[in-house]
């Protein structure tokens, strides 16, 4: 039988389309506003790379002059992708301000956060050094500014400066050691030990706010779970247990550390 014309259904369909359109424009407006804010910051002056990370102190004056010409200042909005896992390596980055997450996607597109970077950290260099695709993804955890250097120019510096090459080897060795420790932490420790380890890692990277108790990092529970190799519900439940035991206090995304030594003990015992 032919379908009868239904005016209510037609109006409902139009209403849904209108709501979707409004939602899309709002989302676009938020994104553009974020881009506008970080574009305004492009006028800010950032010190040369060699004044921010000791890796570059090994450069000669001539190499520093060339690096200043070659490096680019780039801004990323919150959650904007910097590079994808499997993408051809093109740049080495150094974070200037903001925070960046390095992660891999597993089954069901579940993210495993490998590292959270702080200002002046260098990333993307391993893939560029061996001319391989990136083996992880990087995205802006919050609006951030970076220096980036093309792969060929980075490799040319390494090949022409033995001291710089040695410093890159040291940096790679430290990152490898960190990865080995994290592998043990995430596979052998129990849930409490893994979460305590993640909280201590955030504390080491970002420190406290002015009150000397609150972590200077607003991390959603999902991201904290992805750092700790557990489900979001387990992360929420374990945080609540820590709060009940007086180890920390929760206020939305704010986490106040009340007993750092107890967290260290839980992390150590696993």
Question: Which residues does each PLM region occupy?
Answer:
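Cyclic nucleotide-binding regulatory module and flanking cytosolic helices
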Residues: 39-78, 122-123, 127-129
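Short, positively charged and aromatic/hydrophobic N-terminal segments
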Residues: 5, 21, 26, 30-31, ...
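Cyclic nucleotide-binding regulatory domains
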Residues: 55, 80-143
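Phosphate-/nucleic-acid-contacting segments
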Residues: 202-270
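Cyclic-nucleotide recognition modules
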Residues: 63, 115-177, 181
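Polybasic "coupling" helices that flank or enter modular domains
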Residues: 141, 159-229
């Amino acid at each position: 039988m032919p379908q009868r014309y239904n005016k209510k259904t037609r109006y409902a369909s139009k209403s849904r389309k209108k709501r979707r359109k409004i939602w899309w424009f709002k989302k676009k407006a938020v994104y553009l506003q974020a881009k506008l804010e970080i574009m305004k910051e492009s006028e800010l002056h950032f010190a040369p790379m060699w004044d921010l990370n000791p890796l570059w102190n090994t450069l000669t004056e001539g190499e520093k002059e060339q690096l200043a010409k070659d490096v680019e200042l780039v801004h990323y909005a919150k959650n904007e992708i910097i590079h994808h896992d499997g993408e051809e390596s093109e740049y080495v980055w150094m974070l200037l301000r903001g925070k960046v997450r390095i992660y891999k996607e597993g089954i069901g597109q579940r993210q495993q956060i490998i590292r959270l970077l702080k200002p002046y950290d260098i990333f993307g260099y391993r893939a560029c050094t061996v001319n391989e695709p990136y083996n992880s993804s990087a995205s802006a955890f919050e609006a951030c500014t970076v220096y980036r250097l093309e792969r060929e120019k980075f490799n040319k510096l390494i090949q022409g400066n033995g001291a710089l090459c040695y410093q890159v080897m040291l940096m790679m060795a430290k990152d490898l050691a960190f990865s080995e420790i994290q592998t043990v932490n995430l596979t052998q420790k129990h849930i409490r030990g893994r979460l305590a380890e993640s909280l201590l890692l955030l504390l080491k990277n970002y420190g406290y706010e002015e009150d000397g108790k609150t972590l200077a990092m607003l991390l959603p529970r999902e991201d904290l779970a992805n750092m700790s190799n557990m489900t979001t519900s387990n992360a929420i439940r374990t945080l609540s247990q820590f709060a009940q035991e007086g180890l920390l206090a929760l206020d939305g995304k704010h986490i106040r550390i009340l007993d750092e030594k107890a967290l260290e003990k839980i992390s150590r015992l696993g």
